[in-house]
Amino acid sequence: MYNKMVECKNVVYQYKNEDESKNTTAVNDVTLEVNEGEFLVILGRNGSGKSTLAKHLNALLVPTDGKVIVEGLDTSNEEDVWTIRSKTGMVFQNPDNQIVATIVEEDVAFGPENLGVKPSEIRERVDNALKSVGMYEYRKHEPHLLSGGQKQRVAIAGVLAMHPKCIVFDESTAMLDPKGREEVVNTIMDLNKNSHITIILITHYMEEAINADRIVVMDKGKVIKSGVPREVFKDVKTMKEIGLDVPQMTELAYELKKEGINVKDDILTIDEMVNELCRLK
């Protein structure tokens, strides 16, 4: 039996248009559970509501209707907001917007200091967080001299130092080059596998979703699909219809099947494709 980390119950979020003539519904009746220790990916094209939903998971936004519960605490209860944010950290798209100090270790210490953690414990938390993301040797560096991937790992360390049980990554690799993206994705997977932190990854990079425990697909504010990566991605037709890609090898399998070549339709990686083609010899 899994413990529930996050529960979204019929969540609706509306905001006024610029002319204030009517409301726009960004999240429309979303019900979703995230289990403790799970690696969940939320996919959707721009405007699908995925980032708006993400901001509900640590009470940056509260629902217009419905409820979001984080480890039993209702995000609409103002008295619980700081507790919720200490349980559920968030890493945003642009690391420059999340880094507040001029030295790496001072930046990582900022969160625990604001939580009132004792100085001796802050030192330990900062060192452990930087080691967890492979940035300990850069602790005395100035953040602006780091690469994009390194900055994002410092931002992750800043969240880790607050000892969250869950981290939401809101398109945190979108502004990175391929090397930086790989660094951050490897860090995310390591935190989930070895530190057992619940991960909620919002992305539009399909390759990042392959290793998830579960994928949720959003379109027009609604959850339209949910399942393990193989289940979700093999439905290439539906994914294309809503403007999303699938992993390259899944698409290749789809095209081969259309040409009458009998390969599996749930292939995700190059190795799987090679093995499948060798089987057909």
Curated annotation (Swiss-Prot):
A GO molecular function held by the record: ATPase-coupled transmembrane transporter activity
Enzyme class of the recorded protein, top EC level: translocase
Keywords of this entry: ATP-binding, Cell membrane, Membrane, Nucleotide-binding, Translocase, Transport
Compartment(s) where it occurs, according to its Swiss-Prot or TrEMBL record: Cell membrane
Subunit structure: Forms a stable energy-coupling factor (ECF) transporter complex composed of 2 membrane-embedded substrate-binding proteins (S component), 2 ATP-binding proteins (A component) and 2 transmembrane proteins (T component).
Name of the molecule in the record: Energy-coupling factor transporter ATP-binding protein EcfA1
PANTHER family xref list: ENERGY-COUPLING FACTOR TRANSPORTER ATP-BINDING PROTEIN ECFA1, HEAVY METAL TRANSPORTER
Topology with respect to the bilayer: Peripheral membrane protein
Family listed: Belongs to the ABC transporter superfamily. Energy-coupling factor EcfA family.
ABC transporter domain: residues covered: 6-245
GO CC annotation: ATP-binding cassette (ABC) transporter complex
Pfam families reported for this sequence: ABC_tran
Assigned EC number: 7.-.-.-
Lineage: Bacteria, Bacillati, Bacillota, Clostridia, Eubacteriales
Functional summary from the UniProt entry: ATP-binding (A) component of a common energy-coupling factor (ECF) ABC-transporter complex. Unlike classic ABC transporters this ECF transporter provides the energy necessary to transport a number of different substrates.
Originating species: Clostridium acetobutylicum (strain ATCC 824 / DSM 792 / JCM 1419 / IAM 19013 / LMG 5710 / NBRC 13948 / NRRL B-527 / VKM B-1787 / 2291 / W)
SMART domains linked: AAA (SM00382)
Major site of localization recorded for this protein: membrane
Binding site for ATP: 44-51
